[in-house]
């Protein structure tokens, strides 16, 4: 057993863990971060978009020194059928404040940089070690068991990712259900910087974020994504795990077909595959939230299910960062009173209520709303069908626009459209 007792041991050097370590170390706390990967970020996978507001609050102007890829200024939302797509395009040319910006990032580089900031502030990092168990004494978590050694701490922060076995062992989290998560796959495709900028109409460090619904997941709940990096593209898709037993294709085949789609293939043509990754993604929002606080222990980030898929935006990294800061503030308060009980650490939830939990609660009904086959089959077909008729002239007698829309609407069912519309209004 180590003779040192840390103020906090953090399991996982992802965004939540690294931020918590940074905020704690800045205030002189003795912090140990244990990461099972060979480096911070080595095991972390994301589509690739970081909303800056939560980290800007902690490290003002971080983008000037952090390895961010591109500033997102172009947004694309596409409804896709097997061979066609109807795309909405938004370009933000206005001046934005640092907290309003978002960036494409590669986690292996970005997480390593963030952990370096924590180490420079005084945090300690151990890599390549897995935490096997939490050490409890009189019902209170007092440390961890890792690689046969017991290391003690006044508090332990579990930031070990979705499906946290440690949280489950404590009884603070239930076993993850298929309806709570999705399977994500991603390819990193290398292209010259100039080619990326030409294809996506970008200038300088501008970047594009593209989301696709419909055929990428073969009409099942989920969607495709594409983010521009400096000289690579992050391309992938996410599909609800509970829908995969109904899938006619494997997830790798979905990705291959997505890459061959006429709306996607020209964007990645000539690219070189440099990385492939897969990950389980929390999807149920606040509905899969574990018990966040115990005696001597807190849970943050993906381990706490902190992810929001709104269809038009996908958030996870900014929530993890905010949770890491909230956890650190809670531990610092507990250190002042030398009280690490569940009752004292409940301040953590109060901090979260002004950020991640507030946002997650607002959209808590959205996962159920999106888990509707019409969202990913009938509605994309409706959008593409109407667009096709609007832009096709074949010499036959013209048809009023409302009749075109009505004709395609019948295929989905007007009652269904009304029901979905009314439900969407209440959810959004």
UniProtKB/Swiss-Prot annotation:
User: According to its UniProt record, what is one Pfam family this protein matches?
Assistant: FAD_binding_3
Q: Which InterPro entries match?
A: FAD-bd (IPR002938), FAD/NAD-bd_sf (IPR036188), FixC-like (IPR039651)
Listed cofactors: FAD
Keywords of the record, alphabetical order, are:
Electron transport, FAD, Flavoprotein, Oxidoreductase, Transport
Provide any one GO MF term from the record: oxidoreductase activity
Family matches, as Gene3D superfamilies:
FAD/NAD(P)-binding domain
Role played: Could be part of an electron transfer system required for anaerobic carnitine reduction.
Family recorded in the similarity comment: Belongs to the ETF-QO/FixC family.
Please report the name of this protein according to its UniProt entry: Protein FixC
Species of provenance = Shigella flexneri
